[in-house]
């Protein structure tokens, strides 16, 4: 584990321990609504504080971009951390274990390091550009399925932007008719990690934020998968529209989506 990932892991583990304690008394967790179907809790904020403080201490010249607290550090910094302190807030608030801490490091705008930590399972996914992806220190690879009708596809509902719902449901209906099934777990970082480890053969979702997908996407890529936008191009980090899959089914997924564009 290199120094960047070591620092990220120590901070994520500390934040994760706080989350586990908070999960034992959810009635005491304070919750605010940022927008329709978009919640933030004091656990999100506490986690972000732990992560930011650790990164500032270790790397005072790095920029840090967070879901809740915005940006810290110089806008011109060569290194930038993109952090989701609690991906899957709604799951957490309902006692579902599918939530995670997501941390990615960019150098001059290029993803270099990624860590996704799932506290309930104590699972640590990580990747370094050009060096592969790991789950709990074990190398992982995407699935090798070819036939779409044998594939399990992950997705996320556009619950915040309801204007996209009709288009999304038409795409989802097409996927469900042509695959072995669909899964909606409610934490994009973990959905992407599921693609990386082969539990899902592909994943797609619209209108995500950089902190939702940056770390998970690099983990998919380093596990042998491909990540694109809905048209098969780069730019998914900026647009938030993402498709991730093993190389053998990506084109088939993009074809289904293109039929509804």
Question: In which residue ranges do the predicted regions lie?
Answer:
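N-terminal subdomain of lithium-sensitive/metallo-dependent phosphomonoesterases centered on the IMPase/IPPase/PAP
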Residues: 1-86, 226, 248, 255-258
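Residue-level signal for inorganic ion chemistry
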Residues: 19, 44, 55, 89, ...
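Acidic beta-strand-loop-alpha-helix segment within the catalytic core
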Residues: 104-192, 239-261
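A short, compositionally biased
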Residues: 26, 99, 127-131, 221
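Glycine-rich active-site/cofactor-binding loop and its immediate structural neighborhood
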Residues: 79-121
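Oxyanion/phosphate-interacting regions
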Residues: 1-13, 169-177, 190-261
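Short secondary-structure boundary/capping segments
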Residues: 31-32, 56, 71-74, 116, ...
């Amino acid at each position: 584990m290199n120094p960047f990932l070591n620092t990220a892991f120590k901070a994520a583990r500390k934040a994760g321990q706080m989350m586990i304690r908070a999960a034992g008394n959810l009635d005491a967790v304070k919750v605010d609504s940022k927008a329709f179907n978009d919640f933030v809790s004091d656990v999100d904020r506490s986690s972000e504080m732990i992560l930011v403080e650790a990164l500032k201490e270790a790397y005072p010249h790095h920029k840090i971009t967070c879901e809740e607290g915005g940006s810290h550090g110089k806008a011109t910094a060569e290194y930038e951390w993109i952090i989701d302190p609690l991906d899957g807030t709604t799951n957490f608030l309902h006692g579902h274990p599918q939530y995670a801490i997501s941390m990615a490091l960019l150098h001059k705008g290029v993803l270099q390091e990624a860590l996704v930590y799932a506290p309930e399972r104590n699972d640590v996914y990580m990747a370094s550009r050009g060096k592969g992806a790991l789950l709990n220190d074990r190398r992982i690879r995407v699935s090798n399925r070819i036939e779409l009708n044998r594939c399990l596809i992950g997705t996320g509902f556009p619950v915040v932007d309801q204007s996209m719902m009709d288009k999304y449901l038409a795409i989802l209906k097409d996927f469900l008719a042509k695959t072995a099934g669909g899964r909606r777990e409610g934490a994009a970082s973990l959905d992407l990690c599921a693609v990386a480890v082969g539990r899902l053969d592909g994943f797609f979702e619209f209108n995500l934020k950089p902190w939702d997908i940056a770390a998970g996407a690099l983990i998919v890529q380093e596990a042998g998968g491909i990540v694109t936008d809905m048209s098969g191009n780069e730019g998914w980090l900026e647009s938030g529209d993402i498709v991730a899959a093993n190389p053998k089914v990506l084109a088939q997924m993009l074809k289904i989506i293109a039929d509804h564009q």
